[in-house]
UniProtKB/Swiss-Prot annotation:
InterPro entries, alphabetized: Nucleotide-bd_a/b_plait_sf, Ribosomal_uL23-like, Ribosomal_uL23/eL15/eS24_sf, Ribosomal_uL23_CS
Keyword hit for DNA repair: no
Protein name in the entry: Large ribosomal subunit protein uL23
The species this protein was found in: Maridesulfovibrio salexigens (strain ATCC 14822 / DSM 2638 / NCIMB 8403 / VKM B-1763)
GO cellular component: ribonucleoprotein complex; ribosome
Length: 96
């Protein structure tokens, strides 16, 4: 599998910002078929950093939600929390 296609986009949320500052971790949405070693290699090759560990969280699809009168389904996704080595940094939105 091509490592450039594994990482879909970074997670932009309050929790992701907090763990980035506190624990030197970065969160990404990844392909549902990706595993920990593929995510580690993809981050290391894309951003030229050293990765200590990877944790993966999967949200299953199909939960029904009401959006006013409309009932819909939520799609599933997979997130990876990547812990970077000491002194390593990935800068997404610095200076924004």
């Amino acid at each position: 599998m091509d490592y450039t296609q594994i990482l879909i986009k970074p997670v932009i949320s309050e929790k992701a910002t907090d763990i980035k500052e506190a624990a030197n971790q970065v969160a990404f949405y990844v392909l549902p078929s990706a595993n920990k070693t593929e995510v580690k290699k993809a981050v290391e090759s894309a951003f030229d950093v050293k990765v200590d560990s990877v944790r993966i969280v999967r949200k299953r699809p199909g939960l029904r939600r009401k959006f006013g009168r409309v009932v819909g389904k939520l799609s599933g996704y997979k997130k990876a929390y990547v812990k970077l080595s000491e002194g390593e940094k990935i800068e997404f939105f610095e200076g924004v």
